[in-house]
Regions:
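Short strand-edge motifs at loop-to-beta-strand transitions and within beta-strands
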Residues: 1-2, 111-117, 152, 218-224
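Enriched for extracellular/lumenal, surface-exposed ectodomains of secreted and cell-surface proteins
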Residues: 4, 9-37, 119, 123-150, ...
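Surface-exposed loops/turns
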Residues: 9-10, 63, 109, 127-128, ...
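Short flexible loop/turn segments that cap and initiate beta-strands
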Residues: 12-13, 75-96, 185-208
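Extracellular interdomain linker/stem segments of modular secreted and single-pass surface proteins
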Residues: 45-53, 155-163, 258-265
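Short beta-strand segments of immunoglobulin-like
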Residues: 55-61, 167-173
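Beta-strand-rich structural segments
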Residues: 64-78, 135, 174-190, 222, ...
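Short, acidic Ser/Thr/Gly-rich low-complexity loop/linker segments typical of extracellular
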Residues: 100-110, 210-217
Length: 265
């Protein structure tokens, strides 16, 4: 069987099969024969392996938002050869089969591409953390290159939010009494996943309270003893979460508490 040289440039080839003239056989010999030569041609497509080089990708992106990445498809046999494009690529997170980020994007004729990649194309939530972005040449999108991939890392930073704030109705608290308040911390970009063991800060009007950890359901509760010298009227309570290595910070304000002073006739 003929062997195609390893350095053959991918492309379409016409293969000539040649049978030479044979006019010299001794016809007195049994089974001998003479014939004129002929040629036959067959079409051949030479394919080579491909590789995707990612040239530019941001270090991080906010969950639910889009990021832009660029790169190029390379001839994996000889990276110095020009690629004969275009071809199509797809983009997805490694080990996440729930959705493809980009189903198909067409490269230029030299194999380069710039593509906008949504982190949550179906809008059904995305987990936060460091993820591996994979770019893969779509099988069959080019006659000359076999499927190849490239990858790079990106941090998907989750969006957080305080929900279920309490008290939810207007509440009057007397000076000298204690008032309870709190909320639930969730990762809104991941279907309101409850965030446990998060450090939460609270500020009652102008007074900072000791920090507390949210429980397994993401709930944190505070209690504040209102001093007799506290200002009267509607006050604002602010809850703070300073974020983490994979989550954005957030804050919220509770404005349902009014401080009053008891009177004696």
């Amino acid at each position: 069987n003929p062997v195609i040289p390893a350095d053959t440039v991918p492309g379409y080839y016409s293969i000539r099969v040649h049978a030479p003239d044979d006019k010299s056989d001794n016809l007195t010999v049994a089974g001998a024969g003479r014939w004129l030569g002929n040629d036959s041609y067959v079409n051949l497509t030479v394919q080579v392996s491909s590789f995707v080089e990612i040239d530019s990708i941001p270090l991080e992106v906010t969950a639910g938002q889009t990021f832009t990445m660029s790169g190029r498809v390379i001839d994996a046999v000889d990276g110095n050869r020009s690629v004969n494009g275009p071809m199509a690529v797809e983009v997805f997170f490694l080990a996440d089969s729930s959705e493809t980020l980009v189903n198909s994007a067409t490269t230029t004729s030299n194999g380069s591409f710039t593509v906008s990649v949504p982190t949550d194309p179906l809008g059904n939530g995305v987990t936060s953390g460091v993820k591996t972005v994979v770019v893969s040449v779509i099988n069959g999108s080019t006659p000359f290159y076999l499927t190849g991939t490239g990858n790079a890392s990106i941090l998907v930073r989750g969006v957080t939010q305080f929900v279920d704030k309490s008290p939810i109705i207007n509440t009057v608290a007397d000076r000298g009494s204690s008032i309870n308040f709190g909320a639930r911390l969730v990762e809104s970009s991941d279907n309101d996943r409850q965030i446990g063991n998060a450090t939460i800060g609270a500020k009652f009007h102008d007074t900072w309270l000791p920090e507390f950890q949210s429980n397994g359901a993401g709930v944190v509760n505070f209690s504040f003893a209102i001093p007799h010298s506290h200002p009267l009227g509607l006050i604002a309570i602010t809850l703070f979460f300073n974020g983490s290595s994979t989550l954005h910070s957030t804050a919220t304000t509770i404005t349902t508490i009014t401080v009053r002073s008891p009177t004696i006739l």
